């Protein structure tokens, strides 16, 4: 693989990952106590979990076309984040006894259902309303596509060296996981805590986050290229 193509693929994948993290609804500790909307965990942790699942499904398509690998990554990440949000809602509704609503909007942008009268006083919402669920699925898809693209590029580059097919796939997956974490953490710092999805005012920070991930991914791509073609492997 051409070194510039490798850097470009890693950069594009990193930007997709960083952008996708901004779509994922994360409420942190307050959400775990049903006092904020979103999944009750950290931004980087949830995004990385979805990304790792996407990398597993992308790696399962090793040897297929790049589009198939990226599609598999997207499906894996979407399933992981979708199941997480679904189970979370089941706990919020049937365990805690709260209605999935957001305090950031008066009506759900997708369903048009009123939100304000269902928000428990003293909270910022609870559960995962439809807009958060859809936003999370979009974020998972973007992250999975980005991770799959990075995996494919690294795998193609490593196959031309002394590695066998299994060795190339393993090293490519490890590299892809590292690059995924870098961009997930950068996006998490840019968000600065919790976010509900594309309807959250914090979503406006996505431009700055994408620029930061772009720079970090270019550096990561350049370092990866030096390692791959510089004799390390």
UniProtKB/Swiss-Prot annotation:
EC top class named in words: translocase
Pfam annotation, one family: MtrD
TM region positions: 4-24, 39-59, 67-87, 133-153, 166-186, 209-229
GO annotation, biological process: methanogenesis, from carbon dioxide; methylation; one-carbon metabolic process
Taxonomic superkingdom: Archaea
Induction context: Part of the probable mtrEDCBAFGH operon.
Catalytic reactions on record: 5-methyl-5,6,7,8-tetrahydromethanopterin + coenzyme M + 2 Na(+)(in) = 5,6,7,8-tetrahydromethanopterin + methyl-coenzyme M + 2 Na(+)(out)
Keyword terms, alphabetized: Cell membrane, Membrane, Methanogenesis, Methyltransferase, One-carbon metabolism, Transferase, Translocase, Transmembrane, Transmembrane helix
EC number: 7.2.1.4
Record's GO cellular component terms: cytoplasm; methyltransferase complex; plasma membrane; vesicle membrane
UniProt main location, coarse: membrane
Cellular location(s): Cell membrane
Pathway in which this enzyme or protein is active: One-carbon metabolism; methanogenesis from CO(2); methyl-coenzyme M from 5,10-methylene-5,6,7,8-tetrahydromethanopterin: step 2/2
Gene Ontology molecular-function annotations: tetrahydromethanopterin S-methyltransferase activity
Topology in the lipid bilayer: Multi-pass membrane protein
Family that this chain belongs to: Belongs to the MtrD family.
Role noted for this protein: Part of a complex that catalyzes the formation of methyl-coenzyme M and tetrahydromethanopterin from coenzyme M and methyl-tetrahydromethanopterin. This is an energy-conserving, sodium-ion translocating step.
Subunit-structure text: The complex is composed of 8 subunits; MtrA, MtrB, MtrC, MtrD, MtrE, MtrF, MtrG and MtrH.
Protein name: Tetrahydromethanopterin S-methyltransferase subunit D
The organism of origin for this protein: Methanothermobacter marburgensis (strain ATCC BAA-927 / DSM 2133 / JCM 14651 / NBRC 100331 / OCM 82 / Marburg)
Gene name for this UniProt entry: mtrD
């Amino acid at each position: 693989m051409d070194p510039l193509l490798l850097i470009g693929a890693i950069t594009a994948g990193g930007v997709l990952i960083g952008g996708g993290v901004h779509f994922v609804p994360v409420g942190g500790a307050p959400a775990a106590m049903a006092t904020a909307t979103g999944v009750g965990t950290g931004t980087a942790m949830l995004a990385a979990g979805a990304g790792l699942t996407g990398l597993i499904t992308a790696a399962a398509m090793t040897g297929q076309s790049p589009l198939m690998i990226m599609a598999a990554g997207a499906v894996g990440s979407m399933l992981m984040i979708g199941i997480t949000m679904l189970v979370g809602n089941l706990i919020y509704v049937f365990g805690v006894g709260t209605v999935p609503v957001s305090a950031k909007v008066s009506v759900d942008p997708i369903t048009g259902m009123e939100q304000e009268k269902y928000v428990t006083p003293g909270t910022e919402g609870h559960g995962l309303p439809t807009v958060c669920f859809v936003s999370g699925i979009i974020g998972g898809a973007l992250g999975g596509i980005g991770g799959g693209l990075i995996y494919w590029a690294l795998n193609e580059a490593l196959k031309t060296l002394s590695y066998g097919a299994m060795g190339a796939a393993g090293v490519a997956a490890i590299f892809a996981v590292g690059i995924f974490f870098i961009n997930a953490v950068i996006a998490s710092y840019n968000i600065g805590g919790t976010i509900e999805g594309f309807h959250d005012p914090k979503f406006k920070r996505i431009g700055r986050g994408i620029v930061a991930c772009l720079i970090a991914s270019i550096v990561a791509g350049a370092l990866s290229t030096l390692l791959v073609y510089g004799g390390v492997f």
